[in-house]
Swiss-Prot record:
Pfam families: VAD1-2 (PF15310). This is Spermatogenesis-associated protein 32. Residues 353-366 have a biased composition (Basic and acidic residues). It comes from Homo sapiens. One of its GO terms (molecular function) is actin binding. Keywords: Phosphoprotein. GO terms for cellular component: perinuclear region of cytoplasm. Transmembrane segments: none annotated. Disulfide bonds: none annotated. InterPro entries: SPATA32. Residues 214-231 have a biased composition (Low complexity). The lineage of its organism: Eukaryota, Metazoa, Chordata, Craniata, Vertebrata.
Length: 384
């Protein structure tokens, strides 16, 4: 058996014993601190109860009391943890503030640059006005440089009813529209010059002997019966009138120069030209206008229309341009005048039109311009 006591243990030294005693002292010190904290807690509980009794709220919230007590315990038991938590929150807040400040600066700088790049209204409006004015002046300049001028040769122009002007192309369109609407008649050929070479001799014979036949073949052989005002046939329209003028002009100007045509159209005595009481097909009067006395050749005073002495072949030729079988044409009286106009050869417009209209390999001829004025009258009702 060994020696007992402090010096009886050979493996343990004095230092180890002292350390054990120090540990005991530390544990006792901690126990004392915990007891003091419990005593403080017991002292604070009566104070909380007194405060709750003084509170006018009849329904105190028990969760608030439970939440306050652990918070106090943690703050008092672990003051170092509280300090570290506060330092961490401050560091985080500082980092967030440091991060937000550069972002704000960047945003401010970008907004300033973007605003500086935009044009102000004072500089934008004059630019738009200048651009609009420039485009308007350019359009005016273009429109002033480009003009469309409609020109037609004298062979294609005919006048009817004074101020109304038409050509063979517009006449053909009007006639086609009339035929499509249901009017009776044979189809009309568009170029009026197609029938000129085949019917030139016929027109010459008609002009030389205007009184070869006493009555036209298209007139009715029966005497006209008494007609009331409501039974009168409708008068011919402007399209038919222009077509009739075109047929008469083309028949009278076929393969003949102006002097020979005037010589052939000289009239017989005045008595033969007086209209009878019966309805006539046509009566054409020719006279020289005063305003064309210098430029126009000498015109015969009066002449009968060559349509009155046409044969069956001439009737077919006329029907290709004008339907003489209509009752309104048979019973109507057409009065008018024909003016043969010879334009000067030095006219630049007519010279250009001649060069365009004459095909290569043929001689150039002076165009013939015929101006025809007509006046229609309804058939007269014979007296009983």
């Amino acid at each position: 058996m060994g020696v007992t006591g402090a010096h009886g243990f050979p493996c343990c030294g004095k230092g180890s014993v002292e350390v054990a005693e120090m540990r005991d002292d530390l544990s006792q010190h901690q126990i004392q601190e915990e007891q003091e904290l419990e005593a403080d807690m017991l002292e604070q509980k009566p104070q909380l109860q007194v405060d709750l009794d003084l509170d006018p709220d009849p329904d105190p919230d028990p969760e608030l009391e439970i939440g306050q007590v652990p918070a106090l315990l943690e703050s008092e038991l672990y003051p170092a943890l509280k300090l570290e938590a506060e330092l961490d929150t401050e560091a985080n807040s500082n980092e967030e503030s440091d991060f937000e400040e550069p972002m704000q600066l960047v945003c401010k700088i970008e907004s300033v640059h973007s605003n500086m790049g935009l044009p102000t209204p004072q500089t934008f409006r004059p630019w738009s006005l200048n651009s609009n004015c420039r485009s308007f002046t350019e359009e005016n300049h273009v429109s002033a440089c480009h003009h469309s001028i409609s020109a037609q040769t004298s062979k294609h122009l005919f006048w009817a009813n004074k101020l109304i002007q038409a050509s063979e192309h517009s006449l053909q369109r009007a006639i086609n529209m009339q035929l499509n609407n249901g009017s009776a008649g044979q189809p009309i050929r568009s170029p009026l010059r197609e029938a000129i070479p085949t019917n030139a001799l016929c027109s010459e014979e008609q002009l030389q002997i205007p009184d070869a036949h006493s009555a036209p073949p298209t007139t009715s052989s029966q005497a006209p019966s008494p007609l009331l005002s409501s039974d009168l046939p409708p008068p011919i329209d402007l399209t038919e009138l222009i077509t009739f003028a075109s047929s008469l002009a083309m028949a009278s100007s076929s393969r003949m120069d102006l002097p020979s045509l005037e010589h052939m159209m000289k009239a017989p005595p005045q008595e033969a030209l007086e209209p009878s009481t019966e309805p006539l097909l046509t009566t054409v009067e020719e006279r020289e206008p005063e305003n064309h006395a210098e430029t126009l050749p000498e015109k015969p005073r009066e002449a009968r229309a060559p349509l009155k002495s046409w044969s069956q072949e001439d009737k077919n030729f006329a029907q290709s341009y004008f339907d003489f079988s209509k009752p309104g044409i048979k019973r109507a009286t057409i009065k008018g005048q024909i003016q043969l106009l010879q334009p000067p050869a030095t006219s630049p417009l007519l010279q250009g039109s001649k060069e365009d209209s004459v095909p290569p390999g043929k001689e150039k001829e002076n165009p013939l311009l015929v101006k025809i004025h007509f006046k229609l009258s309804a058939p007269t009702i014979p007296e009983k």
